[in-house]
Amino acid sequence: MRYTAAMTPLTPLQQGSAIFSAIVAAPFGAIGIRTEAGQLRELAYLPPHFSEKDATDALAGQACRQVERYLADADFTFSLALPEVGSAFQQRVWGAIASIPRGSVRTYGQVAKHIGSAPRAVGQACGANWFPLVIPCHRVTAAGGLGGFSNHDDESGFHLSVKRWLLTHEGAALAGTPWQQQAMWA
């Protein structure tokens, strides 16, 4: 049987690239940046087969520059304006997570205790985070190891490798299980 070239719909990869206003290369793959109506809408961790994409607007360009600065220097502080998204509970979780210092990790249980909630609910709020890096959910781990990341089942291990890279980049001690957690929120 012979096949000939024909016009075909966009592949899922091409469709995925099209939704982003910019794509920044990263040591673990790429980071997709989506803007809409003058607001940042999403930062997404993308596998290595995504190609870089120049910013399509000024806000995407600003986000690209800040992501690149963070990737070069873990001490960089983001100044991107984030739209108010999520429930009041999710915002409480994200606020607590934003206070975790670089190079440190906290468990889902520690965050839950701090805000008066349950660890599973904290994990669900982490998975609903549209702005990872800026709201650093990678700094929240399970009591006995990395736990999940970005609400993905992660059979490929990609998202956990991103979490591991981010924590290493920020200087978090990854050796040893269970994790040695620092006291916080007395």
Language-model segments: which ranges?
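Compact structured core domains
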Residues: 34-79
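DNA-contacting interfaces and partner/effector-binding or oligomerization modules
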Residues: 2-35
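Structural motif
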Residues: 30, 39-40, 139
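Beta-strand scaffold of nucleotide-dependent catalytic cores
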Residues: 22, 42-44, 149
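Short secondary-structure junctions
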Residues: 12, 52-55, 173
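General helical structural elements
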Residues: 6, 38, 167-168
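Nucleic acid-binding interface residues in structured DNA/RNA-binding domains
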Residues: 16-19, 27, 76-186
